[in-house]
Design a protein with these regions (language model features):
Chain B
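Transmembrane beta-barrel domains of Gram-negative outer membranes and organellar outer membranes
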Residues: 22-174, 219-223, 233-235, 240, ...
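A generic structural signal for short
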Residues: 16, 65-66, 201
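Detector for outer-membrane/organellar transmembrane beta-barrel domains
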Residues: 155-235, 243-244
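Cleavable N-terminal export/targeting peptides
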Residues: 1-33
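C-terminal appended segment following the main domain
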Residues: 245-286
Length: 139, 286
């Protein structure tokens, strides 16, 4: 009985892993239309956020969204080339704190939830954005 | 009457927490819960995280209450924990262990209290970011009120200091594309039943190195399921002290409040076997 249970759990883990690993993140996000929807949601959420919205007062929204679409496409294996500033350059002079970075994470999660992205896809995208933290904060 | 803190104190304190909402800080759930020994962690096991959600610079104070009911015993614990700059944590815990009616002759106090004063220092790494997992060292000074009972059972003393080292990491998008928290701690201890039955024993006064482990999977940012295992020393002769384990569900609706419900298996306590039951824990922060 215990063996059966373990076998069932193992096969569950195996299937879950293979199904998710087979899906390119870019496709899981819904390809170009999905990424566009995601970026619209994220930029709106950032702009309206009480704590980080002020950082976007002078931002050219169209330019910002175009670069963010490229970047998300690039890091999700969608094959795009990111043509914007480096992360250090883009956040230079802002001196973002760790708390503000966390506000961005929270806002991104809210935006993705509102836009209907599943938790697993949210986690995968955030896992790929997380390594950039060092290039974003305290610049 | 500080010797026997009432659960009511915690219940009175906790609802205040959301009014003093910390509006910014770390991501929620990254402060863990207040453990039975007041340090931030899971239910039974301290983690390398700092209580609450302070970042640099910042101070955060957390209050927690837990209640454990197994076959023949109850354990209530109340903890206060403060952290500075996501670096250093001080905690104060008060536990009350109660033996169920009928197990002891009339006239003997069925309650044992213990005070735990803790300090924890984050020494390296980060819970989520960078190459290294978060690491911390901690000390816990424990004072058990059970000098007579513990002495009669063979314990050498009723207060002692324990040291531990914890490594904790949140893995983003692990199996099932879920975020997983893993913790491993090593503790040097001479405690009998975490100190409730004193420390050391006649004929063996060495510290034991014990391992304590937690694993949790976040279904989503609000709900996690997990398990813990806490190794314990051999204990007093004839009492059959066991390792402790639990399986829990945690609800973290925001940065200020969390609730965990667990099934705990405390094995044999004071020669009474099959001590499994329910554990409930609440943590709120300012």
């Amino acid at each position: 009985m215990r063996f059966m249970l373990m076998a069932a759990m193992a096969s569950l883990v195996f299937t879950a892993c293979t199904t998710t690993r087979e899906t390119r993140l870019y496709d899981a996000l819904g390809g170009a239309p999905g990424v566009a929807k995601l970026v619209d949601a994220i930029s709106a959420e950032y702009r309206d956020d009480a704590r980080i919205g002020f950082l976007f007062e002078d931002t050219d929204q169209d330019y910002f969204k175009a670069r963010l679409r490229e970047q998300i496409c690039a890091i999700s294996d969608g094959g795009c080339e990111y043509t914007g500033l480096s992360m250090e350059e883009a956040h230079s002079g802002m001196d973002l704190s760790e708390a503000q970075f966390n506000d961005f994470v929270d806002a991104s999660r809210r935006a993705m939830t509102k836009a209907g992205f599943a938790i697993g896809v949210q986690n995968r995208l955030l896992a790929r954005l997380a390594p950039m933290r060092g290039e974003v904060i305290h610049q | 009457m500080l010797r026997q803190p009432s659960p009511l104190i915690a219940l009175l304190l906790l609802p205040i927490a959301p009014l003093h909402a910390a509006d910014e800080g770390r991501l929620k759930a990254t402060g863990g819960l207040v453990t039975i020994e007041a340090a931030a962690g899971g239910g039974l096991v301290p983690w390398a995280v700092m209580a609450g959600s302070s970042t640099r610079p910042g101070v955060d104070v957390v209050a927690g209450f837990s209640a454990t009911q197994v076959a023949d015993f109850r354990l209530a614990s109340l903890g206060l924990s403060a952290s500075w700059n996501d670096r250093f944590e001080l905690s104060l815990g008060r536990q009350q262990f109660t033996v169920d009616r009928g197990l002891l002759p009339a006239g003997i106090d069925r309650r044992i209290g213990q005070t735990v004063l803790g300090a924890k220092l984050r020494i390296a790494g980060d819970l989520i970011y960078g190459d290294l997992p978060q690491m911390a060292i901690g000390l816990q000074y424990k004072h058990s009120d059970s000098d007579v009972l513990a002495g009669a059972l063979g314990a050498r003393r009723n207060d002692d200091v324990e040291a531990y080292f914890s490594v904790t990491r949140l893995f983003l998008a692990g199996p099932f594309d879920r975020n997983w928290l893993l913790n491993g701690s090593v503790r040097a201890t001479r405690a009998n039943e975490t100190g409730l039955l004193g420390f050391g024993r006649i004929g063996d006064d060495d510290h034991a190195l014990v391992g304590e482990f937690s694993a949790a999977m976040f279904f989503n940012p609000e709900f996690a399921i997990g398990a813990e295992y806490r190794q314990k020393p051999d204990g007093l002769p004839g009492l059959g002290e066991s390792d402790w384990r639990d399986v829990f569900v945690a609800w973290v609706p925001n940065r200020r409040f969390s609730l965990a419900v667990a099934w705990v298996d405390l094995g044999t306590i004071a020669a009474r076997p099959d001590q499994d039951g329910v554990f409930v824990s609440m943590t709120g922060n300012w």
